[in-house]
């Protein structure tokens, strides 16, 4: 019994600032795509991921204005395993020159390349579209910084890949990073919750 409580979500971004929204990501968010090899230019390493190879690196141009995004970014990427399995670890960083900060990551056993819990048999040499999803994040990329994506076989806090077979990264229209843009002009999302009780309003 009693009045219905207000329903909202409190979000903290990677700089420690808080805001409030009725849903997350915010309603009507614009979705922006960064194609690998285009908006995310190939910046280093070969196009092959294996436990012994250097990172495959992609990076944007410096942003002309502050860029905010949140939710669970998606990385859908064409890959060609050279064995009966493989693993991909994707690291997103906010970079200012050579100084980078980890803002999010995702990891996938390629036997589950379609997403969900359905296991698939991997045929060597057959190209797949791996549908990866990052852990939830809320990120501010300052003006002049870049967004960097690094691909490797595993992360520092994860077990080694189940197979050492290399995985080739394929560029093209179906290899994209998708993010939900946070609009800082929507000021009501950045105001703290307001008390509407008569005792508050009368103060």
What are these regions (language model features)?
Residues 1-203:
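Glycine/threonine-rich phosphate-binding loop and adjacent beta-strand/alpha-helix elements that clamp
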């Amino acid at each position: 019994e009693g009045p219905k409580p207000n329903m909202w979500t409190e979000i903290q971004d990677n700089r420690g600032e808080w805001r409030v929204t009725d849903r997350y990501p915010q309603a009507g968010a614009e979705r922006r795509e960064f194609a690998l090899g285009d908006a995310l230019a190939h910046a280093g390493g070969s196009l092959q991921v294996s436990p012994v190879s250097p990172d495959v690196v992609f990076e944007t141009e410096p942003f002309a204005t502050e860029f905010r995004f949140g939710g669970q970014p998606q990385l859908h990427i064409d890959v060609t395993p050279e064995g009966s399995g493989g693993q991909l670890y994707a690291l997103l960083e906010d970079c200012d020159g050579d100084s980078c900060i980890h803002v999010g990551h995702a990891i996938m056993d390629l036997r589950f390349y379609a997403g969900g819990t359905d296991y698939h048999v991997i045929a060597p040499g057959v190209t797949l579209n791996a549908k990866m999803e990052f852990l939830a994040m809320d990120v501010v990329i300052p003006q002049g910084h870049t967004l960097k994506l690094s691909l490797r076989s595993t992360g520092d806090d994860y077990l080694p890949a189940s197979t050492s077979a290399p995985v080739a990264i394929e560029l093209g229209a179906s290899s994209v990073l998708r993010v939900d843009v946070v609009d800082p002009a929507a000021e009501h999302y950045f105001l703290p919750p307001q008390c509407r009780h008569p005792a508050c309003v009368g103060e």
